[in-house]
Amino acid sequence: MAGRSGDNDDQLLLAVRIIKILYQSNPYSKPNGSRQARRNRRRRWRARQNQIDSISERILSSCLGRPAEPVPLQLPPIERLRLDCSEDCGNSGTQGVGDPQISGEPCMVLGAGTKE
């Protein structure tokens, strides 16, 4: 893996193998039995799956030395966010080409269809 030492790669591969074994140790239950029995099996399977998810996250964070989730993106306050159709209307990739729409009417991405 680019930019890291081989020792870290070996640790990461070992962690991935362990996580794979954990997930393989919890197969989904067979669909037989009464409705209540199936529901209980699914509930227990889901609980085990959640435990495996948290254990896997802990293994990866200890192996990588950082949380698996990226740092959340800082967004401006909601009051400053707006959609203004007069600035750019559809046609991504062609911004700044042609005449801008300045009419007071809303943009039409799809034209009015005719029913036959």
Swiss-Prot record:
Residues 26-48 are annotated as: Disordered. Keywords: AIDS, Host cytoplasm, Host nucleus, Host-virus interaction, Methylation, mRNA transport, Phosphoprotein, RNA-binding, Transport. GO terms for molecular function: DNA-binding transcription factor activity; RNA binding. Residues 36-47 have a biased composition (Basic residues). The modification Phosphoserine is found at residues 5, 92. Its main location: host cell. It is found in: Host nucleus, Host nucleolus; Host cytoplasm. A motif (Nuclear export signal and binding to XPO1) lies at residues 73-84. Homomultimer; when bound to the RRE. Multimeric assembly is essential for activity and may involve XPO1. Binds to human KPNB1, XPO1, TNPO1, RANBP5 and IPO7. Interacts with the viral Integrase. Interacts with human KHDRBS1. Interacts with human NAP1; this interaction decreases Rev multimerization and stimulates its activity. Interacts with human DEAD-box helicases DDX3 and DDX24; these interactions may serve for viral RNA export to the cytoplasm and packaging, respectively. The RNA-binding motif binds to the RRE, a 240 bp stem-and-loop structure present in incompletely spliced viral pre-mRNAs. This region also contains the NLS which mediates nuclear localization via KPNB1 binding and, when the N-terminal sequence is present, nucleolar targeting. These overlapping functions prevent Rev bound to RRE from undesirable return to the nucleus. When Rev binds the RRE, the NLS becomes masked while the NES remains accessible. The leucine-rich NES mediates binding to human XPO1. This is Protein Rev. It comes from Human immunodeficiency virus type 1 group M subtype J (isolate SE9173) (HIV-1).
